[in-house]
């Protein structure tokens, strides 16, 4: 598969991560990665709404 990551590649990456960090730290890494993705999505949605001038329902209620 050109330009994509298939199942064999994902398995190899997972094995390498297990070797480097160990099974005990995987939950910590997963939680940190999840928080990072959540913050990234929140920041991008805030930037998009600021660029288009849209207001979120929470922002409209705060100004009342």
Swiss-Prot record:
Keywords assigned: Cell inner membrane, Cell membrane, Membrane, Protein transport, Translocation, Transmembrane, Transmembrane helix, Transport
GO cellular component, one term: TAT protein transport complex
GO MF terms, alphabetically ordered: protein transmembrane transporter activity
Transmembrane intervals: 1-21
Main location: membrane
Gene it is expressed from: tatA
Function: Part of the twin-arginine translocation (Tat) system that transports large folded proteins containing a characteristic twin-arginine motif in their signal peptide across membranes. TatA could form the protein-conducting channel of the Tat system.
Species of the source: Syntrophobacter fumaroxidans (strain DSM 10017 / MPOB)
One of the protein's GO biological processes: protein transport by the Tat complex
Keyword Transmembrane assigned: yes
Gene3D superfamilies: 1.20.5.3310
Its membrane topology: Single-pass membrane protein
Subunit record text: The Tat system comprises two distinct complexes: a TatABC complex, containing multiple copies of TatA, TatB and TatC subunits, and a separate TatA complex, containing only TatA subunits. Substrates initially bind to the TatABC complex, which probably triggers association of the separate TatA complex to form the active translocon.
Protein name, as recorded: Sec-independent protein translocase protein TatA
UniProt-listed HAMAP family: TatA_E
Keyword Cell inner membrane: yes
Positions in coiled-coil regions: none
Subcellular localization: Cell inner membrane
Family: Belongs to the TatA/E family.
């Amino acid at each position: 598969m050109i330009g994509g990551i298939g199942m064999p590649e994902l398995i190899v990456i997972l094995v390498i991560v297990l070797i480097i960090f160990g099974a005990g730290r995987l939950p910590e890494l997963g939680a940190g990665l999840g928080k990072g993705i959540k913050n990234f999505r929140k920041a991008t949605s805030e930037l998009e709404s600021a660029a288009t001038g849209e207001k979120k329902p929470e922002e409209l209620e705060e100004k009342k």
